[in-house]
Amino acid sequence: MNPSEMQRKGPPRRWCLQVYPTAPKRQRPSRTGHDDDGGFVEKKRGKCGEKQERSDCYCVCVERSRHRRLHFVMC
């Protein structure tokens, strides 16, 4: 086979990576119980004892595994 026959026919391949933005800086709580805008962040315990923080814009669930690693889940 010559190099021209080895080329793939059709449109060229393009790699596409989607990067999801993180929460804007104003939505991240800087102090426990408060967000950056001065609003209060409500804390709860879930069914399995995981910590849940809920503010006006988002909810963060912190789960603890048996290997003592924290898993952050955006709700």
Curated annotation (Swiss-Prot):
Biased composition (Basic and acidic residues): 32-43
Keyword Hydrolase: no
Region (Disordered), start-end ranges: 22-43
Keyword Membrane found: no
Location of this chain's protein in the cell: Nucleus
Note: Protein expressed at very low level. This Np9 protein is encoded by a human specific provirus.
Protein name: Endogenous retrovirus group K member 24 Np9 protein
Upper lineage: Eukaryota, Metazoa, Chordata, Craniata, Vertebrata
